[in-house]
């Protein structure tokens, strides 16, 4: 298997982040020409080019990711239960290999591309490279929506969603999101079923190697990225967050940027949550501001902006991706609860009047803060 290999000063990068694929530039409501340094909206996703997706179709039902070293199943079969996905992987000899597994949420998220676009419940352009991967939609003939096409990961949420559901994280490559999905479908009184794609290879992928540099920064030598150790305790809209990171000077470095969606998701710690560890879903080497939820309850943690626009809805350029390091809360049946799980990836409007937020949106009443927090990133020099 061919794999590109990168090194830092301390060794091989084992967790290379695949770029989002974004090449267009956006304001709060339009496609724009590429901003220059000092311009409004400079520093967004397309400003910086990372490890570009590079796949090989092996002609045997498998796809090699030449960046991550992971080997993937090309096709998706029928929807299946969480347990059935493990049985399928254990019994598979696809491509002549017998060490297939259910991917972790970080492995699975390595495949997402934010060149996709969704239109509410209808699919548009998928958030995965369809030149290599077959991605099914929800079956509208049985009452599903096209976006009901979620993919299981092996990552079990350490908390619970919906006031008691055992929850598994998954990626939706039709609408471009991570959330926690119930293991059991209460309405059908049966195990929940979702799509599934097997993986093998690079068992170090998704494992961080954090070092506290003692100067307000944290290096992850698995990804080759250096992070701002502590947020500054302030919420900002998207444009202001881009500018904050671009102008940040910290530990003698001035090349900080707002991380893209895949970079920021790489530092989520899915073994932690407010419910179970009384902490954000991030390694305690980082410092994270505690906030109150929209009802004034303490013990929550912010959503953090990324530089990535999320193309969704009638005004597709108006929202950007965030990662929830606290609970992914929503208000359902007039009750505020964790509906998506700490570590979910959703999107917020890029801008709005402060006195109108937080508010609630969509069928699960997603909390919208708009004024989200920032943790800046830079690339470690090789």
Task: Cite the ranges covered by each PLM segment.
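Glycine-aromatic-enriched surface loops/turns that form tight recognition elements
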Residues: 10-101, 105-256, 262-382
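Sec-dependent, cleavable N-terminal signal peptides
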Residues: 1-12
